[in-house]
Amino acid sequence: MRRALLALSIPLATTALAQTPLPSHGPAKGYLVITGGVPDYKNFLALAGGKDAHIVVIPTAAITGPGEKRLPPYCSAPGPFAGLKCTVLHTIDRKVADSLKFVAPLRDATGVYLEGGRHWRLADAYLGTLTLKGIFALLDRGGVVMGGSAGATIQGSFMVRGSSDPDDNTIMMAPGHLVGFGLFTNATIDQHVDARGRENDLAPVMKAHPELLGIGLDESTSITVHGDTLTCNGPRRAAIWDGKDHYGKGYYYLRAGDTLNTATRVATLVSHPPDP
């Protein structure tokens, strides 16, 4: 049975770093579903309107070159959005991404799915364009954006693992590719943490930028961000890097049902069985 919630800064005995962390904010009206790699279609589609959803898929991060044509059947069987109103948008041409014709499907969309791959491709194609403005407008209407892996990291304001030349995602801070979409402000997001042994990879980023809220997602974990509330949906963990020392680590874990006020950095935890 779910026990009483405990509201506290975890842990109580922490040491703040010299620079005070800044508040982080998600969309005031809309929602972000951010996953460590495995898509959370259930929560995404529920927030997008269920059978009445209009989904826009942006697969750009996964497309390796102009000749790439082998895309999954997102909008048709057996794809995840079969039977729904669904549109695929892709370009690497910034002029196209900044055109009214290209962004037209976003005007009445209720959900955007950002495919995984290399998030620098998303940044290069869409930062500063009408496409990104259309995504923000969708959130202002109460819509939802979901992304895992690259589609997770791009949602933050500070982009890690963004190196394009060389194309090396072990480089945590790549000059020229540090700016994400900023759907989640003053935040940086890492992914595939448990599957790829990335538990401490955010440490140098947080040392250089202690004002940020850092989030490290296990591969099967999703979080939902709405306003100043981050909810961990599970089933695994979300590591929260909040600029404090937590018994020798720079982070602590949220699990399914736990929430975080991203403005105050106060976590609200539920009772969980011990890890096996």
Language model segments and positions:
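Structural recognition of the beta-strand scaffold that forms the well-ordered cores
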Residues: 33-35, 54-59, 87-89, 111-115, ...
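C-terminal and late-domain segments of enzyme folds
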Residues: 19-51, 62-69, 76-81, 159-276
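A general structural motif
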Residues: 29, 50-53, 109, 142
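A short, aliphatic-rich alpha-helical micro-motif
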Residues: 106-107, 139
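Class I SAM-dependent methyltransferase SAM-binding "motif I" and its flanking Rossmann-like core
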Residues: 115, 121-196
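Bacterial N-terminal signal peptides
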Residues: 4-15
